Amino acid sequence: MFAMIIYVQNLLIKHFSNLRDLDKITPEDMIQSYEVNCVGPLFLARELLPLLKAAVNPEQPKFNINQAAIIMMSTAVASIEENSGGGIYPYRSSKSALNMAMKSLSVDLKETGILVMAMHPGWVKTRMGGPNALIDTETCCSGMIETLNSLTEKDHGAFLRYNNTTIPW
């Protein structure tokens, strides 16, 4: 038996108006983004933990996608090290908080064998990504599937792109 959670969380808050300048964002923008991008995913993972723990097969390798896994959709713009553009405060900050929550969860769940990590799907040509995005949905999905199928213990607590490259925190 195996279980996997891929919580694809690409909600558009106020038609993605969170790409506002510092002088235009509100505390409500920040709070709403934090609730959607960090609080919701973390508490969903917490509620599903009993099922995930029950799905771990001790006879199989730990931290394997064919075991229990919590893989949250993040974004490269949440990388503190790679932030050279600034702005996007609500989205960037709330996804950085999600990354911290996933890193902490990976530490807390290490002994369970449940794989925990954050993944960036890429800048995808969707309603959110727009027409200037770098990849189409087929490239995104096929890359993510390939990456997911290759995950091992070394990826526990990682932050990866859809093409299996590491993103610095």
Regions found by a protein language model. Give the residues of each.
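A glycine-rich helix->loop->beta "capping" turn
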Residues: M1-Q9, N18, E153
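Residue-level recognition of the N-termini of beta-strands and the immediately preceding loop/turn
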Residues: M4-I6, N66-A69, I114, D155-A158
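Hydrophobic structural elements of the Rossmann-like NAD(P)H-binding subdomain
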Residues: V8, I71, V116-M119, G129
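Catalytic loop of short-chain dehydrogenase/reductase
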Residues: I13-V39, L49-K110
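C-terminal helical subdomain
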Residues: A118-P121, G130-W169
